[in-house]
Amino acid sequence: YFFFSFRLTTGQLTLGANAVSSSKLVKSLPGFDGLLPFHLETGYVEVDEVNGAELFYYFVESDAGGEDAPFLLWITGGDHCSVLNGLALEIGPFQFVIEPYDGTVPRLKTNPYSWTKVALLLLSYSGSCPV
């Protein structure tokens, strides 16, 4: 079993209990006009030091009040299931603009129903296929 704790601080996710992580603040995305209007962080957290296994994650701050907001952990898994599904197709702060494909980068827009309206959101992948 693997255990690590999360401690949320202003503007960043801090991982404890010997978990090593690397992260990057994402300020823009292809297909989204302008800077992102929310705090999006991506990175890897080490889950098996001996074998060098890491999990990729997206972290999005809540619109509802930072550290006092509820914390939601969304884990995807299984063959052909990307953590991007949760971020852009299900509960995340942006979604694809539905329009006929014209050969360019798909456009993105903010999701008015994002769960980040009420909670801090950590999305990660834990599945049976290689990522």
Task: Give the location of each predicted region.
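Catalytic-loop region of hydrolases
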Residues: 1-71
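N-terminal cap/lid subdomain of alpha/beta-hydrolase-fold enzymes
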Residues: 58-131
